[in-house]
Amino acid sequence: MMEKSLNTVTSLPLRVIYCIDRASAIRCLAKSQHAVPIQVLKEVEPKKVICQVDIQHVIQTVCRCSPELSCKSQGDFSVYFLDHTEPDELFVGLGYWSSLLLSPTLNAGTSNSDTVWVNGFIVEFGIQRSIEIKLRFQSLQNSFEVGTPETHTSSKFLSSTLPPSLIFDPSSSEKSDSISGSLFDTNYTCPVNINGLSKQKSVRELKSPSRPSALAETNVEELELDSLFHASNDISCSATSFSEPYILDHQAALDHPATDPVCSASSTTVNSAVSTKKRRRESSTISPESAYVAAQLQNPSEREQVHEFIKEQVRIARGRIEKKFTNVRGKNRIEEQLTLSLQEGKIPPYCQNCGTIKTANWRNATYMNITLMLCNACGIYWTSRRSMRPRNLWSTYKAFETEKPLENDAFAQLELAVYKLSQQRKLSISIFRELENAGRHSPLNRLTSLDSTHSAPDPNHISKPSVVNQQKSRGGPRTAKLKNDLRRIQSSPIVAPTPDTSFREPLSEIGSNDSWLVLPNSLSANIQNDVLRKTDFMCTDKENVAFPLKTTTKPMPKVNKEETEPTLPVCDSEKENDDLECYFRTPPKPTTLQKQQQSPSPWRSELFLSDPDQNVLTPRHKPKFDLSKALSSVAKSNNIENSPQLPERYDFSLELGLNSQLDNEERRDIPLMTDLVMPSSPPMVPADRHLSVENTC
């Protein structure tokens, strides 16, 4: 940056930008009527020149444009100006505003050593150039006049230039001291003024913290502003530099015992008045803030405004305590929050995803130990889908990217600025970068496509999502397909993963949001061979397993359509066959009949639950038995003995297929009655064996 010093003097109009109090966001502008002499210090840039001007021109411009600053009822201020010659452009203090008003620099003929200089930049507005000075006024709650030699010597010069109302009269302070001294003779203790309140009263309030709030208990009808002003003015013993000392009680000062002809009654009158005022101050429930504000106001119109303000605050406080006022909701609450944020000078809360500032509720989303503040729509979308709401669903994107808001709409302009800020800050937040890499800024259909890229290339795997998408586009029911897929998952055997097997896909491929449930891909030929080589007790659905038929077995005898009832399995002890798989198969039913869906039963899938070491053989050919010849008339009359249930005495029950007393040829010739064996009942012991055993006993 190039700097160039210029020691030239010129004249330019003056612009003074100032604000009152640090918390105030209102800036004021004061312009001079004529050009004032300035001195050029240096040129920082080609169009940025720093100049300095005498403080007297600044004071005259501010007093002419803002006369309330020179009013004695406003109190005193501390003044600061922005020094552009400092490296960080700091605010430099100039002291009391009253001292600047009383300074001799307001008059001609002063030396250059006593001149106070302030600096600023030269600004251009069109074809007019002017020097711009920035000031800040900080109000002082208690400003005591400090006697200095400059103050007394400058009063003579001030009387010729300022009106009499702005000139401080030191005799008023002496008069107030004499009056307060005369009152001390009557044993009256005047409390020290602290922030416009009694020190004794503040001490009493600190000693009793259990005292309820004044706003909640104050009766509006009993608040008399005149009594407030008398009570506050009675206890003020000091005066500011621009206000005359307020006498404690004019009537009490006139009725002093030394000047009153009736001296005996005057002392008792003063004492009674003092005690009455003490009791009034003790019994008063006025808040310190209300008393201070009332003490500072002397205009009747301002008193009425304060009175109405106190009434409104008391009414609101009582209404909130009694829960009569409902919470502000909807659009009014949103605008109230935005207005409050603007008054505080802060950025309103906004959604870190879509950047909106108008929402019914705010929600927090936690991901990777990072908490994000989201609007109601983005928060619900994140909770339900664990992904950020896409841009095409944002109301801000539709409002600001496609069309521009109106220039006269303040809230729309604010929302546009916050939206741009949020999109800029998203680039610096790590959680959005991680979600973007994981594909979590889009709906779940994109997430499934990312998962499918990790699986091995399989033609079945590629065709499956297309079929699901076609069904989804047609809008047809997918309930049957979902049930079949879920049944296949539950019935499929557990196989250890191998490098040849493919990864499983999420359930979103079939249109479900349950991501914990996965679907198997099409099995390879190696896995199918492994399943076929498993033993029988590892398979849960043996009816649907298609085992190859052996050519060495006997052909299936022809049966009629009416004789399709279940058969009792028997074994052929004379036949020696090492192939055990043929004995664990259920004979296929005739193809002419339509297979009916039957309820699952453990007796149908596993006839015998035995140890692996024990050989229980079941022949493929199951002839029928007819026990009608073996049952006698006496046995038929006894229903308990001839019931199809097993006998109560299990000691005499013989194992099926291991009894050598019955001839194999006789078993094949005797048909079995359908009334004794149910489709889902366990295998029964032949009744002829049972009867023969009982007869022997």
UniProtKB/Swiss-Prot annotation:
InterPro entries, alphabetically?
Spt21/Ams2, Znf_GATA, Znf_NHR/GATA
Cellular component GO terms, alphabetically? chromatin; chromosome, centromeric core domain; nucleus
Intracellular or extracellular location(s)? Nucleus; Chromosome, Centromere
Q: Which UniProt keywords apply?
A: Centromere, Chromosome, DNA-binding, Metal-binding, Nucleus, Transcription, Transcription regulation, Zinc, Zinc-finger
Biological process terms from the Gene Ontology for this record are:
CENP-A containing chromatin assembly; positive regulation of transcription by RNA polymerase II
Specify residue ranges for compositional bias: Polar residues. Answer: 445-455
GATA-type zinc finger span: 351-378
Q: Name one GO molecular function term.
A: zinc ion binding
Q: Where is this region: Disordered?
A: 443-484
Pfam families found in the cross-reference section: GATA
- CDD domains, A to Z: ZnF_GATA (cd00202)
Q: What is its main location?
A: nucleus
Q: How does it assemble?
A: Interacts with CENP-A.
Please give the function described in this protein's UniProt entry.
Answer: Required for proper chromosome segregation via regulation of CENP-A localization to the centromere.
The entry's protein name is: CENP-A multicopy suppressor protein 2
List the taxonomic lineage: Eukaryota, Fungi, Dikarya, Ascomycota, Taphrinomycotina
